[in-house]
Amino acid sequence: MAETTASGYIQHHLQNLTFGQLPNGGWGFAHSAAEAKEMGFWAFHLDTLGWSVALGLIFVLIFRMAAKKATSGQPGALQNFVEVLVEFVDGSVKDSFHGRSPVIAPLALTIFVWVFLMNAVDLIPVDWIPQLAILITGDAHIPFRAVSTTDPNATLGMALSVFALIIFYSIKVKGIGGFIGELTLHPFGSKNIFVQALLIPVNFLLEFVTLIAKPISLALRLFGNMYAGELVFILIAVMFGSGLLWLSGLGVVLQWAWAVFHILIITLQAFIFMMLTIVYLSMAHEENH
């Protein structure tokens, strides 16, 4: 790596491959966090976009392959795995979703597998993919992050998609009047029309904050846990470059131990994101508040 200090190494691994408009008016890649910041809102994290799309395609190809090879006879290992996964997700939907919609189970399955695959990239040694990017581009300073869920843009994008579905189903099931009433007539109510009118701003403030908190908490929970996990891997990798034999040996042990524990984290975070999506959409399908 071009960065010789521990801080430079860490900063390089925590920076996205950002493409946007440079100060000179041209378009190109940012080679530092300062350059990426100057690009503003319309900068693109190409590593996040690329890995998200690639892993989504891998998910589709695996399940398509399993569907083509599905048989009523002796199932293969892939078919068994997919069937167990589908039954697990379907059971989770039946337990937590109290409405009727053919979309929820496929959506939950997509979220769980897709988020899990994006999280699982964190198990790849931290230097492998950045070094591969350097070999391909020939640019020793180019940053490249492979774990899409450590980018708040990715987690917030998924959370906003779920939020859009919450709004859509709330209006579809309850009607626009019911949706507005849910935001303005609860949690405080009164039979006195004048008092109820006074309570509308208070109710709206409370319910609006609760509504907005759903996508924000959904995004930040996944981002925070995965970002912290990646940072631990990077800090452990710094031990290998310390030049001290005993510290490098400790790094090997810690790397293995954290990787084993991290398997639980990446699975749990995918499950939590899926379950919260199911619960939020179930609440959107409820007729009464």
From Swiss-Prot:
Protein task: Key component of the proton channel; it plays a direct role in the translocation of protons across the membrane.
Family classification: Belongs to the ATPase A chain family.
Cited InterPro entries: ATP_syn_F0_a_bact/chloroplast (IPR045082), ATP_synth_F0_asu (IPR000568), ATP_synth_F0_asu_AS (IPR023011), F0_ATP_A_sf (IPR035908)
Domain of life: Bacteria
Statement: the UniProt record of this protein carries the keyword Signal: no
Localization per Swiss-Prot or TrEMBL: Cell inner membrane
A single Gene Ontology CC term: proton-transporting ATP synthase complex
Keywords: ATP synthesis, Cell inner membrane, Cell membrane, CF(0), Hydrogen ion transport, Ion transport, Membrane, Transmembrane, Transmembrane helix, Transport
Record PANTHER family: ATP SYNTHASE SUBUNIT A, CHLOROPLASTIC
UniProt key word Transport: yes
Membrane spanning residue stretches: 43-63, 104-124, 160-180, 193-213, 232-252, 259-279
GO-annotated molecular function: proton-transporting ATP synthase activity, rotational mechanism
One GO biological process term: proton motive force-driven plasma membrane ATP synthesis
Protein name: ATP synthase subunit a
HAMAP family cross-referenced by the UniProt entry: ATP_synth_a_bact (MF_01393)
Any single Pfam family the record assigns to this protein: ATP-synt_A
Record membrane topology: Multi-pass membrane protein
Protein species of origin: Pseudomonas fluorescens (strain SBW25)
Subunit: F-type ATPases have 2 components, CF(1) - the catalytic core - and CF(0) - the membrane proton channel. CF(1) has five subunits: alpha(3), beta(3), gamma(1), delta(1), epsilon(1). CF(0) has three main subunits: a(1), b(2) and c(9-12). The alpha and beta chains form an alternating ring which encloses part of the gamma chain. CF(1) is attached to CF(0) by a central stalk formed by the gamma and epsilon chains, while a peripheral stalk is formed by the delta and b chains.
PROSITE patterns: ATPASE_A (PS00449)
